[in-house]
Amino acid sequence: MSRLAKRHPDLLSCNFNQDYSCIAVGHKKGYTILNCDPFGKVHSNNDQGATGIVEMLFCTSLVALVGAAENQPSNSPRKLQIVNTKRQSTICELIFPTSVLAVKMNRKRLIVVLENEIYIYDISTMKLLHTIETGPNPNAVCALSSSSERSYLAYPSPVPSASSTPLSSSAIPAPPPAPTTGDVLLFDTISLTALNVIQAHKTPIAALALNSTGTMLATASDKGTVVRVFSVPDAKKLWQFRRGSSSARIFSINFNLMSTLLAVSSDTSTIHIYRLASSRKGGKDADDASTEEARSPTPSETPLASSPPLAAGKLDSHSAASSLRRRSYHLGKSFVGGVGGYLPKSVSEMWEPQRDFAFIKLRGNHGRTVVAMSATVPQVMVISSEGLFQAYNIDLENGGECSLMKEFALLGSEDFGNGSNGI
């Protein structure tokens, strides 16, 4: 999740790129791209205006931007811009019916998340391939694998309405209800087919993460006491980790690039790092009283597999939006509505959840945090809504508490808006 609590008066968003080598920062004057190691500014644009979302495509010059000015059409939160920072040119612009809450990219697909819909594009042509109606997802909870071969999308599964009526071609169906259980839907963005429904938790999903190869999915619920890791796409539970005994709001989950460690940040002062040991060991459900089940759809329950791709174009057409809603509604109604008939693939396990391998104690009022692990040095990196970048050394043999080694400001004085004195 890239949007941060606005502790720093000028910081609007902040996130790592797919391999955690760079940081993309959105602020009131525009956006900035920073290198992690060595830390430093790579590119900035202070003429863009307030920018609420900045997403990079690895270390390329392709960047996705979403504005944060409701009263300025040129910088609207409904407008997505794809820009080339090297050429300083705009590749394309798309207007959406509601505010864009998140953008995800890999080398094959671009994903745009609205509160009730997810749009899937071919990133090479910006052709709209498919739209999924998700039901209310105001926190834009989703994850896209950075792998081109396993380009999987995970998002909270909508709960089917008990009073659902057959879909009429003459009317736009009501949106599916908001997710009230901890089911996760796994979707293949290449074949445009639903792969699995995972009963990950019994309370709503708060955070999701896919590893770099698209073979593991980490999940956390809004209870925030347990983090689980499942294999993808067969959805077998591999690990279960204890974050704490008290509830917490999970801010971020990230695997390292080797998929040997998993880092989790929350609204507590502790960041947890878990070791994904070779002995893949599940755990007794700490926030669930029943067995988790991984469920696979039958061919008759995956209508998207036979649906032809949708045409590209601007999305401000009422008729086009109506068509997208009618087509994508089948995912929530037919596929998710039939999960009760799927066979369970796993049984309850008897081990207690594993504790963390290493941890970071944050000082002071840290606000919202995003955590990631360096691919080049044994360090855990933390960016915060205070406008700080911090790097902590981690002992990969013994674990324990990580030590702070570096700290830098994400915004320079030239990035500050009027009346701001910085950090």
UniProtKB/Swiss-Prot annotation:
One of its GO terms (biological process) is glycophagy. InterPro entries: PROPPIN (IPR048720), WD40/YVTN_repeat-like_dom_sf (IPR015943), WD40_repeat_dom_sf (IPR036322), WD40_rpt (IPR001680). Keywords: Autophagy, Endosome, Membrane, Protein transport, Repeat, Transport, Vacuole, WD repeat. A motif (L/FRRG motif) lies at residues 241-245. It is found in: Preautophagosomal structure membrane; Vacuole membrane; Endosome membrane. Pfam families: PROPPIN. SMART domains: WD40. GO terms for molecular function: phosphatidylinositol-3,5-bisphosphate binding; phosphatidylinositol-3-phosphate binding; protein-macromolecule adaptor activity. Disulfide bonds: none annotated. Residues 282-295 have a biased composition (Basic and acidic residues). Residues 281-317 are annotated as: Disordered. WD repeats lie at residues 200-240, 245-284. The keyword Repeat applies. It is a peripheral membrane protein. Signal peptide: none annotated. One of its GO terms (cellular component) is phagophore assembly site membrane. Belongs to the WD repeat PROPPIN family. The N-terminus might form a beta-propeller domain involved in specific binding to phosphatidylinositol 3,5-bisphosphate (PIP2), leading to the association of the protein to the membrane. The L/FRRG motif is essential for the cytoplasm to vacuole transport (Cvt) pathway, for the recruitment of ATG8 and ATG16 to the PAS in nutrient-rich medium, and for its recruitment to and dissociation from the PAS under starvation conditions. The PI(3,5)P2 regulatory complex regulates both the synthesis and turnover of phosphatidylinositol 3,5-bisphosphate (PtdIns(3,5)P2). Necessary for proper vacuole morphology. Plays an important role in osmotically-induced vacuole fragmentation. Required for cytoplasm to vacuole transport (Cvt) vesicle formation, pexophagy and starvation-induced autophagy. Involved in correct ATG9 trafficking to the pre-autophagosomal structure. Might also be involved in premeiotic DNA replication. Component of the PI(3,5)P2 regulatory complex. This is Autophagy-related protein 18.
